[in-house]
């Protein structure tokens, strides 16, 4: 299992002028009530002023990180995780971190030696890594690198789940809970469009933890607030929810209303361009981003449960329709929409200026998430879309847990979890919880609540899943909703029933 915080929003930075700028950008998330878990800092060399002194180096840029331990402590006090970008120059890597380091061999080719270069920085409080480059490596070397960023951190923090966002890997990298992103793509509508089937196919290869640079990495003349928002909406339903790219201040949820795109850094890319001044004072962007940030955090109980299912079965979080509807030829052919878990259908809007989105609903009943309107499946429908709407549909029979809005995944709250029932069919759901940080779940320290909806009797039952136990400090208060009806309950570990 990856750490819970890795499923929160992640904000990447490029060139930073000073320590003060870095801290100010972090504080803006909390002041503006924009949920965020992770701040990612690019390395110098890939931008003029990143976290370190140069590509592949582990010394800090004193202009931005004059006292890195103090700065990391300040960011942690605001409940942010810190992820650092690292570049490898070697074309080969072999072995594991527990091997003896051979001084006669190149350091970067040996995980045991190379991880040692990370350790002093890691001990300052870094929470995760962003291993970039490595494209010339062969498959075995890529997997050795994936493995190093899983096993290396555990040498120093043996009961803390590592996080690493990789540029590359291969089938099998999922055994190290490796995240993958789609690379340095261009900011175009066509790029956004093709990312939907790319996401689906990546999951089908066995690599479930995938995402993209929201808005595309290289700005073009198509890079507008509209494209950014449509990409942001799509990314809210990817396992990795992360914004990154050149003209980096436009990657901030409030960045489209400041007049400042940040350092351009686009001269080396054919077809690159900055948005016109008319795009840089758009007050619509921030509230729409907030809407999808808050929705992502509300859906964390559902998403984390899907991650548990992925861990135990290999079934990806983003799913081709045919995984659940293999005998439906239309579902088999659709690559422009996907299932998120088993119960939510996501139809990203990928056409500029779209006011309608054609959506195929497989057999059974489906509810519009935004309006609760019910539709019969087995048909195409046209959904009206404005700029803030991406079509979402919930399967009849679904049991959908929605938590309270949080500003970060670890925020404590006494608010109950909403359990929304979508009638019209029987359904089941396993609500999975653990501490989100450690490996204790491997020893039985996890809480699973098995829920079953019986449509004919309008009854929801709950019971503790076999092999799990009640955990203190985890949500056990629920507001169960069926349409306009609502009932409060507290789950104590004993079988319970809610009847409507």
Where are the predicted features?
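Catalytic-domain carbohydrate-binding cleft regions of carbohydrate-active enzymes
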Residues: 1-389, 394-395
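Accessory, solvent-exposed terminal regions and/or long lumenal/extracellular loops of proteins
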Residues: 389-500
């Amino acid at each position: 299992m990856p750490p819970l915080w890795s499923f929160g929003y992640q904000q990447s930075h490029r060139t930073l002028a000073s320590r003060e700028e870095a801290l100010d950008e972090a504080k803006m998330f909390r002041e503006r009530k924009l949920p965020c878990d992770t701040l990612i800092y690019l390395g110098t060399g890939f931008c003029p002023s990143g976290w370190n002194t140069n590509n592949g180096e582990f010394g800090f840029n004193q202009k931005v990180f004059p006292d890195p331990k103090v700065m990391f402590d300040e960011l942690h006090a605001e409940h942010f995780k810190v992820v650092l970008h690292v570049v490898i120059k070697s074309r080969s890597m072999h072995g594991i971190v527990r091997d003896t380091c051979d001084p006669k061999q190149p350091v970067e080719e040996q995980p045991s030696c190379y991880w040692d270069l990370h350790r002093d920085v890691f001990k300052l409080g870094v929470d995760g890594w962003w291993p970039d480059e490595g494209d010339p490596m062969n498959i075995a070397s890529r997997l050795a690198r994936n493995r190093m960023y899983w096993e290396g951190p555990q040498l120093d923090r043996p009961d803390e789940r590592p996080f690493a966002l990789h540029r590359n890997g291969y089938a099998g990298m999922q055994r190290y809970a490796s995240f993958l992103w789609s690379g340095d793509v261009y900011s175009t509508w066509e790029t956004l469009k093709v990312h939907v089937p790319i996401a689906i196919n990546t999951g089908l290869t066995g690599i479930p933890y995938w995402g993209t640079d929201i808005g595309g990495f290289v700005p073009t003349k198509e890079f507008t607030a509209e494209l950014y928002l449509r990409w942001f909406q799509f990314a809210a339903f990817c396992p990795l929810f992360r914004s990154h790219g050149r003209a980096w201040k436009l990657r901030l949820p409030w960045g489209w209303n400041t007049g400042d795109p940040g350092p351009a850094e686009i001269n080396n890319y054919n077809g690159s361009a900055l948005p016109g001044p008319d795009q840089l004072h758009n007050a619509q962007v921030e509230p729409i981003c907030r809407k999808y940030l808050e929705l992502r955090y509300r859906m964390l109980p559902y998403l984390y449960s899907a991650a548990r299912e992925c861990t135990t079965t290999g079934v990806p979080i983003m799913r081709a329709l045919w995984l659940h509807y293999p005998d439906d030829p239309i579902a088999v052919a659709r690559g422009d929409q996907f299932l998120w878990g088993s119960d939510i259908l996501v139809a990203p809007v990928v056409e500029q200026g779209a006011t309608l989105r054609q959506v195929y609903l497989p057999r059974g009943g489906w509810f519009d998430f935004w309006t609760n309107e019910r539709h019969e499946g087995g048909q195409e429908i046209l959904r009206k879309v404005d700029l803030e709407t991406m079509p979402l549909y919930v399967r009849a029979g679904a049991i959908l847990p929605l938590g309270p809005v949080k500003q970060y995944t670890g925020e404590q709250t006494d608010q109950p979890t909403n359990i929304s029932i979508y009638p019209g069919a029987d359904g089941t759901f396993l609500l999975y919880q653990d501490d989100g940080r450690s490996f204790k779940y491997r020893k039985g320290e996890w809480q699973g609540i098995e829920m079953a909806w019986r449509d004919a009797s309008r009854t929801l039952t709950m019971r503790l899943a076999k092999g799990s136990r009640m955990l203190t400090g985890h949500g056990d208060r629920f507001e169960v909703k069926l349409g306009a009806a609502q009932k409060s309950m507290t789950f104590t570990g004993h079988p319970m029933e809610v009847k409507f």
